[in-house]
């Protein structure tokens, strides 16, 4: 209908706002990574009052949501612009346009693995013919992804590596700090999986085992993504203006997304085969459990691979003793409340 077409066309007004916001955010990420999170807070905080105005006051419906999201980007753009102005004070040199166009495939290739990864939901839905399993998966994912927040700690290393600073000591400290955040968040998700699901909805309580495997995967991914950032941040192939296409193909800027692409493709193939074999004889919770196990196992070899590459490129030493003690203390700290919780919590259907 004409109304639907007008709504689709109105989405075009969001594109410039998102475009400029992401560009300025990327500039700040290279030298002031904390500003990226300031911008996110400003962006999300601006959406709420503007949505109230467009939806409640003016009653604009879907078009009001589009306008609100567009306007909400403006404060975030201004914030990023204030911090980024030191880096964009020179005039735009159009001689770099050819190089930008030549290398425009690289960011797209980097995001291809993420697109491939999202197909697991589609595969599960097609094979099972239902979205019931997705409900259990989504509920478990809300609890399991808590440890993802630890990945923010590694963001500050990337700009330091771009500045060509001595990286070994920086990486060693970053891995330690990353562990200090990731370990407790992981243990919280695992030990309190059942209460977390019960709080969302009692019918999801049976998927608590799913959270354990999802949490393991999230924890592994936090480390593998940090290692990937170390590798790409240390790559200098894009510093020279005369870098050839072949040099980019051989660089870590191409290696890391290619490795992820292989990983996710293998994961999807394995998931498809397993679901086709066990679908008729399994419940939805069991199917989601298989899904989470395959997801976790697919991350392990690539964590090892990225770690080997990091060890080859940097000199650092893991603080195994301190991290082991920290892990044991965390297990005791969260394990005791877990075993005592049945005395104080009742899980009624």
At which residue positions do the language-model features occur?
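Interfacial/gating helices of multi-pass transporter permease domains
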Residues: 5, 62-63, 99-103, 121-144, ...
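Membrane-interface junctions at transmembrane-helix termini in multi-pass inner-membrane proteins
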Residues: 16-39, 163, 216-262, 268, ...
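Helix-loop junctions and terminal segments of transmembrane helices
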Residues: 29-30, 145-168, 174-177, 228-239
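Interhelical loop/hinge segments that connect adjacent transmembrane helices in multipass membrane
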Residues: 9, 34-38, 62-68, 78-118, ...
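Transmembrane alpha-helical segments of multi-pass transport proteins
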Residues: 43, 113-114, 290-295, 321-349
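Interfacial segments at transmembrane-helix termini and the short loops linking adjacent helices
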Residues: 1-11, 190-222, 237-238, 242-248, ...
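Hydrophobic alpha-helical transmembrane segments
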Residues: 38-86, 138, 144, 258-273, ...
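Interfacial transmembrane-helix starts/ends
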Residues: 101, 158, 162, 166-191, ...
């Amino acid at each position: 209908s004409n109304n639907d077409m007008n709504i689709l066309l109105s989405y075009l007004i969001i594109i410039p706002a998102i475009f400029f916001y992401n560009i300025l955010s990327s500039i700040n990420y290279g030298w002031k990574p904390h500003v990226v999170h300031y911008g996110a807070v400003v962006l999300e905080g601006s959406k709420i009052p503007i949505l109230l105005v467009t939806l409640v006051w003016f009653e604009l419906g879907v078009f009001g949501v589009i306008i609100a999201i567009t306007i909400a980007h403006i404060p975030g753009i201004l914030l990023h612009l204030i911090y980024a102005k030191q880096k964009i004070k020179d005039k735009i040199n159009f001689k770099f346009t050819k190089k930008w166009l030549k290398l425009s495939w690289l960011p797209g290739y980097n995001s291809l693995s993420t697109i491939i990864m999202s197909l697991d939901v589609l595969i599960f839905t097609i094979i099972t013919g239902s979205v019931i399993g997705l409900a259990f998966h989504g509920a478990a994912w809300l609890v399991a992804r808590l440890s993802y927040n630890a990945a923010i700690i590694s963001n500050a290393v990337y700009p330091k590596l771009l500045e060509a600073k001595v990286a070994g000591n920086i990486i060693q400290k970053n891995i330690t700090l990353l562990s200090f955040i990731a370990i407790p968040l992981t243990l919280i998700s695992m030990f309190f999986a059942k209460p977390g699901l019960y709080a969302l909805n009692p019918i999801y309580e049976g998927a608590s085992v799913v959270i354990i495997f999802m949490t393991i995967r999230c924890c592994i991914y936090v480390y593998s993504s940090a290692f990937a950032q170390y590798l790409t941040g240390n790559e200098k192939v894009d510093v020279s203006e005369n870098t050839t296409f072949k040099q980019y193909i051989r660089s870590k800027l191409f290696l890391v997304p290619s490795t992820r692409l292989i990983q996710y493709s293998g994961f999807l193939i394995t998931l498809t085969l397993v679901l086709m074999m066990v679908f008729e004889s399994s419940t939805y919770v069991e199917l989601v459990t298989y899904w989470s196990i395959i997801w976790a196992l697919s991350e392990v070899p690539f964590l090892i691979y990225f770690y080997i590459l990091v060890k080859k490129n940097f000199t650092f030493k893991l603080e195994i003793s301190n991290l082991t003690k920290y892990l044991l203390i965390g297990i005791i700290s969260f394990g005791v409340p877990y075993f005592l919780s049945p005395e104080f919590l009742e899980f009624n259907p």
